[in-house]
Amino acid sequence: MNDLIINHIAELILPRSTDKPLKGKELDELNVVKNGTVVIKDGKIVYAGTHTDDYDATETIDASGKVVSPALVDAHTHLTFGGSREHEMSLKRQGKSYLEILEMGGGILSTVNATRETSEDDLFKKAEHDLLTMIKHGVLAVESKSGYGLDRENELKQLKVSNRLAEKYDLDMKHTFLGPHAVPKEASSNEAFLEEMIALLPEVKQYADFADIFCETGVFTIEQSQHYMQKAKEAGFKVKIHADEIDPLGGLELAIDEQAISADHLVASSDKGKEKLRNSDTVAVLLPATTFYLGKEDYADARGMLDNNGAIALATDYNPGSSVTNNLQLVMAIAALKLKLSPNEVWNAVTVNAAKAIDINAGTINTGDKANLVIWDAPNHEYIPYHFGINHAEKVIKDGKVIVDNTVSFKA
């Protein structure tokens, strides 16, 4: 006897199972089954396809008028941080620049100070709350970066917190050491600080899957970023890079040359970099909520990347300064509106390709897969990026069990 059948599904979203990320035109290929059925036993998918009465189960969910998809994958978050920076919104409205806010004690270094001052247990409680919000919105696989400690003690603290979260909730969670995220005030130079972070690589390896660096004007150069990435690979890490967010320094090209698993942001990437994606499996992780939140007009050139047969994914970039959202559904809407992605491209970019960007087996619904699913209160898959700003996730299913039920009942 099977454990659960979900039947009469209006639309069942079945992204293609693939060893490599979907590239170029492949991103627009999505198998959407009308009147679908999913059968689950022992936390795994037994059957997913057109409606059938050939299976029995101890529990049945009628998904008439609903959409069912793989659980979403958020491939770029800064989940563990102390404090918040809501007061900076009014300063920005007054015309204060980022550097002026930084000089006033705000900006990233204020988050560094808050993170350093927050105990590991308190940091865990805060990150747990934010993670549960993500789960309620349909995410069951997450990448979590450090980068607000900027010293040995606090970088380790952030990574330990994300590892504790993964263990407590048994999530598909990957952890990224982003020690070179900024340069702390106490550092004698960018170069000296980078060497401190490189020296930490062997110690943080037990807590982190990836090593990341912020390659940008005023932070770390192309040459410094390459040095760090090579040292990280020698220490056994797969590498990522925050690249070309503000200036076209060539971070995308570097990511491809160093065979990074992903390059993230890429708002200012050059045509040369986009062309190099053609022969690479490096995933371009685009973060349109960041551009939106910062009030900028120029978004990453998703269409140009796809036209060059590149692989792209979408993520929230959840952080306290430039993308204060842990709702990946909102990112889906912004991507459709501002990156000009089709609904099919959006869905693939937050499932199978996002999974490739963090090297996990997720984002598909195939026989033998973990039964990590979302039942959406929506008539079709195009509706979710169309109707933005609310939570469409009705039920979140992890390993075949309903762990979130957002159904709301009102009493007159």
UniProtKB/Swiss-Prot annotation:
<feature type="binding site">
    <location>
        <position position="242"/>
    </location>
    <ligand>
        <name>Zn(2+)</name>
    </ligand>
</feature>
<feature type="binding site">
    <location>
        <position position="148"/>
    </location>
    <ligand>
        <name>N-formimidoyl-L-glutamate</name>
    </ligand>
</feature>
<dbReference type="GO" id="GO:0005737">
    <property type="term" value="C:cytoplasm"/>
</dbReference>
<feature type="binding site">
    <location>
        <position position="76"/>
    </location>
    <ligand>
        <name>Fe(3+)</name>
    </ligand>
</feature>
<keyword id="KW-0963">Cytoplasm</keyword>
<keyword id="KW-0408">Iron</keyword>
<comment type="pathway">
    <text>Amino-acid degradation; L-histidine degradation into L-glutamate; N-formimidoyl-L-glutamate from L-histidine: step 3/3.</text>
</comment>
<keyword id="KW-0369">Histidine metabolism</keyword>
<feature type="binding site">
    <location>
        <position position="78"/>
    </location>
    <ligand>
        <name>Zn(2+)</name>
    </ligand>
</feature>
<comment type="similarity">
    <text>Belongs to the metallo-dependent hydrolases superfamily. HutI family.</text>
</comment>
<feature type="binding site">
    <location>
        <position position="85"/>
    </location>
    <ligand>
        <name>4-imidazolone-5-propanoate</name>
    </ligand>
</feature>
<dbReference type="Pfam" id="PF01979">
    <property type="entry name" value="Amidohydro_1"/>
</dbReference>
<comment type="function">
    <text>Catalyzes the hydrolytic cleavage of the carbon-nitrogen bond in imidazolone-5-propanoate to yield N-formimidoyl-L-glutamate. It is the third step in the universal histidine degradation pathway.</text>
</comment>
<feature type="binding site">
    <location>
        <position position="321"/>
    </location>
    <ligand>
        <name>N-formimidoyl-L-glutamate</name>
    </ligand>
</feature>
<feature type="binding site">
    <location>
        <position position="78"/>
    </location>
    <ligand>
        <name>Fe(3+)</name>
    </ligand>
</feature>
<feature type="binding site">
    <location>
        <position position="317"/>
    </location>
    <ligand>
        <name>Fe(3+)</name>
    </ligand>
</feature>
<feature type="binding site">
    <location>
        <position position="181"/>
    </location>
    <ligand>
        <name>4-imidazolone-5-propanoate</name>
    </ligand>
</feature>
<dbReference type="GO" id="GO:0008270">
    <property type="term" value="F:zinc ion binding"/>
</dbReference>
<dbReference type="GO" id="GO:0019556">
    <property type="term" value="P:L-histidine catabolic process to glutamate and formamide"/>
</dbReference>
<keyword id="KW-0479">Metal-binding</keyword>
<dbReference type="InterPro" id="IPR006680">
    <property type="entry name" value="Amidohydro-rel"/>
</dbReference>
<dbReference type="GO" id="GO:0006548">
    <property type="term" value="P:L-histidine catabolic process"/>
</dbReference>
<feature type="binding site">
    <location>
        <position position="148"/>
    </location>
    <ligand>
        <name>4-imidazolone-5-propanoate</name>
    </ligand>
</feature>
<keyword id="KW-0862">Zinc</keyword>
<dbReference type="GO" id="GO:0005506">
    <property type="term" value="F:iron ion binding"/>
</dbReference>
<dbReference type="GO" id="GO:0019557">
    <property type="term" value="P:L-histidine catabolic process to glutamate and formate"/>
</dbReference>
<feature type="binding site">
    <location>
        <position position="319"/>
    </location>
    <ligand>
        <name>N-formimidoyl-L-glutamate</name>
    </ligand>
</feature>
<dbReference type="InterPro" id="IPR032466">
    <property type="entry name" value="Metal_Hydrolase"/>
</dbReference>
<feature type="binding site">
    <location>
        <position position="317"/>
    </location>
    <ligand>
        <name>Zn(2+)</name>
    </ligand>
</feature>
<keyword id="KW-0378">Hydrolase</keyword>
<dbReference type="InterPro" id="IPR011059">
    <property type="entry name" value="Metal-dep_hydrolase_composite"/>
</dbReference>
<dbReference type="InterPro" id="IPR005920">
    <property type="entry name" value="HutI"/>
</dbReference>
<feature type="binding site">
    <location>
        <position position="242"/>
    </location>
    <ligand>
        <name>Fe(3+)</name>
    </ligand>
</feature>
<protein>
    <recommendedName>
        <fullName>Imidazolonepropionase</fullName>
        <ecNumber>3.5.2.7</ecNumber>
    </recommendedName>
</protein>
<feature type="binding site">
    <location>
        <position position="245"/>
    </location>
    <ligand>
        <name>4-imidazolone-5-propanoate</name>
    </ligand>
</feature>
<feature type="binding site">
    <location>
        <position position="322"/>
    </location>
    <ligand>
        <name>4-imidazolone-5-propanoate</name>
    </ligand>
</feature>
<feature type="binding site">
    <location>
        <position position="76"/>
    </location>
    <ligand>
        <name>Zn(2+)</name>
    </ligand>
</feature>
<dbReference type="GO" id="GO:0050480">
    <property type="term" value="F:imidazolonepropionase activity"/>
</dbReference>
